[in-house]
Each structure stands twice: as structure tokens, then as C-alpha cells.
């Protein structure tokens, strides 16, 4: 039995076609972006960025995880990220913030995230999710 969804399987098959040279070039490009973001944060004296996790609410059901545009850059750069659930909409679908820290400053990110949770007075989000 195939355990992958069609899109996941297609993505994996495309990945297998990438040559070692192409992979090295992609990784080099990712490293350039990592270095740029690190320098930008340092030069701008930015301890953390706050951004929505997604441009919209979470999708209903388990067919998709939703829109990844708001967090793919952090995956590419390897920056540490903490996601803070901040509420649910009228359909009981969650929305969240992501707090993005700097390289090697995970402890500072934890402190900043705790401060944000306390400032926003976020308690446990009430929901009626049934994952069964």
C-alpha cells in the first residue's frame, strides 16, 4: 500500500531527479540567503520577528496543512521558530503567531516568546477538535 498522498509522492519523485551538482548549487544558494538574513538581523539589531503562521485560518479537515508561504523562509534559513496558538475563529479553526529568533539564540527566543504570551494574556486555547 502506498503511504504517500499523490502530491507528496510526486514531490519525492521530482526530488530523486535532482543531480548532486544541482543539489550542491541549491544548498549554496540557501547558505547565501541564510548569511543575508543573519547579517540583516544583526545590522538591524532585530532580536525576533513576529509573523502570522499563515495568511488565513487553518483549513478544515486533514486533507492539507494549509498555506506554507509565511514559514517556508524560516525553514530555508534554519532560523529557530516558536509557534504560539492565539485563538480560534467562528468555525473553531486555529490561528497562530510565529516568533522567529536569530541563529544560536534559542534561549532568547524562548524568553521573548514567554514575554509575548504573558503580554497577550494567552491561556490555553479552548477548542472542540476531534482528531479521531
What is the predicted role of each segment?
Residues 1, 34, 41, 116-120, ...:
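Structural signal for hydrophobic packing residues in well-ordered secondary-structure cores
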Residues 1-38, 85-96:
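Short helix-loop capping/hinge segments that flank enzyme active sites or metal/cofactor-binding pockets
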Residues 24, 62-63, 76-132:
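Structural helix-boundary/capping segments
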Residues 36-39, 69-71:
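Generic recognition of flexible, low-complexity loop/linker segments
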Residues 44, 54-72:
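Short, surface-exposed loop/helix-turn segments at secondary-structure junctions
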Residues 47:
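Conserved acidic residues
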Amino acid at each position: 500500500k502506498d503511504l504517500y498522498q499523490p502530491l507528496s509522492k510526486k514531490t519525492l519523485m521530482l526530488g530523486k531527479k535532482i543531480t548532486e551538482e544541482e543539489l550542491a548549487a541549491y544548498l549554496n544558494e540557501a547558505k547565501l540567503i541564510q548569511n543575508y538574513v543573519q547579517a540583516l538581523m544583526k545590522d538591524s539589531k532585530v532580536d525576533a520577528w513576529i509573523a502570522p503562521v499563515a495568511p488565513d485560518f487553518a483549513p478544515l479537515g486533514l486533507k492539507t496543512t494549509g498555506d506554507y508561504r509565511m514559514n517556508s523562509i524560516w525553514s530555508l534559513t534554519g532560523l529557530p521558530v516558536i509557534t504560539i496558538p492565539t485563538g480560534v475563529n467562528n468555525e473553531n479553526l486555529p490561528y497562530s503567531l510565529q516568533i522567529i529568533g536569530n541563529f544560536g539564540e534559542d534561549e532568547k527566543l524562548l524568553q521573548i516568546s514567554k514575554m509575548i504570551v504573558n503580554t497577550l494574556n494567552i491561556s490555553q486555547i479552548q477548542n472542540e477538535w476531534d482528531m479521531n
